[in-house]
Amino acid sequence: MKDIISVYDFSKSDFDELFELADKLRNMSTYPKILKEKTVALAFFEPSTRTYLSFNKAAINLGASTIGFSGEEGTSIAKGENLADTIRMLNNYADMIVIRHKFDGAAKFASEISEIPVINAGDGKHEHPTQTVIDFYTIYRNFKNIDGLTFGLMGDLRYARVVNSFLRALTRFKPKKVYLISPPQLSARKEILEELNYPYREVIDYNEVIEEIDVLYVTRIQKERFPDESEYEKVKESYVVDMNLVSKMKKDAIILHALPRVNEISREVDKTPQAKYFEQASYAVPVRMAIFHKIVGE
């Protein structure tokens, strides 16, 4: 596997292998140095905390040195250097590139120029494939399976790249049902829905379906996406996970969030058995270590 640009780059067996490898890596006190004498470039044209640091830690754990930036300030990009030239430059300095960019398709564009492997760490509102592997690994850890579960994705389903990757990755499995819970202004994109091979239903009021859901994936309602602020005011409180919502969920259901959150999950929910988003974040390093293994073929 040379590049990871989309979740479609993973087969069902790839997911299974990554889960198994992440399990092994989580339990190791020392790690195989499969990236010894290698350099990983972290080219984060958008600022990042969790993704940047977890990729950095994963690479170092496997013996690599890392170079890179998070945000364009202080780089030649801020002076106007184009993406193609930056990627060509990084090919001279590194053995692998992890890229995050604000434009859809930037990771694929980079992979077409690059002679070294490229991993997509989020491109615009397109995809975030390695986050989805973390999401699915969290589900696997809690349910031992992904097939047969009922999913609810709630909040901004139009602009959140994690949603696109999540929905696409589910085509590799057999979910019982998927509920897409959002205001009409932020409903999932038609082109994404046309790719799905499993039953789904679009819902405005979570109360209609919350009791059925095994996995609730929450994203932030983005005020800046609404052309009319009054429309945002109408829906902003409708998609907050609070204790009232949790009380209606199955006892063994789980709540996921890619983080960072703003106010879409109340702090009081953090201590409930359903809250798994910090556990989810803790899997970022072992899962991304497993992804590096997949890239180098070891």
UniProtKB/Swiss-Prot annotation:
Top-level taxon of the source organism: Archaea
E.C. designation(s): 2.1.3.2
Alphabetic keyword roster: Pyrimidine biosynthesis, Transferase
GO molecular function: amino acid binding; aspartate carbamoyltransferase activity
Amino-acid positions noted as binding carbamoyl phosphate in the UniProt annotation, renumbered to this chain: 50-51, 100, 128, 131, 259-260
GO biological-process terms attached to the record: 'de novo' pyrimidine nucleobase biosynthetic process; 'de novo' UMP biosynthetic process; amino acid metabolic process
Enzymatic class: transferase
Coiled-coil residues: none
Reaction equation(s) it catalyzes: carbamoyl phosphate + L-aspartate = N-carbamoyl-L-aspartate + phosphate + H(+)
Keyword set includes Cell inner membrane: no
Pfam families found in the cross-reference section: OTCace, OTCace_N
Residues the record lists as binding L-aspartate: 79, 161, 220
Known pathway: Pyrimidine metabolism; UMP biosynthesis via de novo pathway; (S)-dihydroorotate from bicarbonate: step 2/3
Subunit structure: Heterooligomer of catalytic and regulatory chains.
Physiological role: Catalyzes the condensation of carbamoyl phosphate and aspartate to form carbamoyl aspartate and inorganic phosphate, the committed step in the de novo pyrimidine nucleotide biosynthesis pathway.
Similarity-based family: Belongs to the aspartate/ornithine carbamoyltransferase superfamily. ATCase family.
Name by which UniProt lists this protein: Aspartate carbamoyltransferase catalytic subunit
